Regions:
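Mg2+-dependent prenyl diphosphate-binding active-site environment of isoprenoid biosynthetic enzymes
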Residues: 1-170, 178-188
Length: 190
């Protein structure tokens, strides 16, 4: 752990603002309308409906008994919304219909939820070397996680359900979805 949590937060904030800078750049070869749609979607995913809102819930749920649905909502906002944007952006650029864009947003939300739960699993039982940060912090702070609610093994089983659901949804893309399927397994088993 080289720089600490506060530096990591600042780096994350800087990277997020760089994303807006890139999307607004005149050198980005997409229509102005598409740029506006991407910036709007990224704003939704990073503001109170996304990352910032999820982080707020994370802090406000500490040391409280929180339902499974509220934990999932928090984790989707906290992490899933960013993955949602990443999966929806190509569909927005390709001018897909609203249904297709929503499909990819949902895939991204599930991938982000899986990533967040896997991150919580590493924090619970993993090493600082793998995590790249101190582990065991969630339990000490009384964080509301699926692990604290369901237990370690049940959280893993929930992740397996997310992977099965996502793979089923991606089936229509055949071998084109191979990399995503491999990534899902990597996320859980890293």
């Amino acid at each position: 752990i080289k720089f600490g949590e506060s530096t990591a937060v600042l780096a994350g904030n800087s990277l997020l603002t760089m994303a807006f800078e890139i999307l607004a750049s005149p050198s980005l070869q997409i229509s102005e309308k598409t740029k506006v749609n991407l910036i709007k979607k990224l704003s939704e995913c990073s503001g109170h409906l996304g990352i910032a809102g999820g982080q707020y819930l994370d802090l406000s749920y500490e040391k409280k008994k929180i339902s499974k649905s509220k934990i999932i909502e928090m984790e989707i906002k906290k992490t899933g919304k960013l993955f949602s944007f990443c999966c929806a952006a190509p569909a927005i650029i390709k001018k897909k219909n609203v249904k297709e864009i929503k499909f990819f947003e949902n895939i991204g939300s599930d991938i982000g939820l899986l990533f967040q739960i896997a991150d919580d699993l590493i924090d619970f039982k993993g090493s600082s070397k793998i995590a790249g940060k101190k582990t065991g912090k969630d339990q000490k702070k009384g964080k509301a996680t699926l692990i604290s609610l369901l237990g370690y093994m049940n959280a893993i089983q929930y992740c397996d359900k997310i992977i099965l659901k996502t793979n089923k949804n991606l089936k229509r893309y055949g071998s084109n979805s191979k990399n995503i399927k491999e990534t899902l397994n990597y996320i859980l088993h890293r």
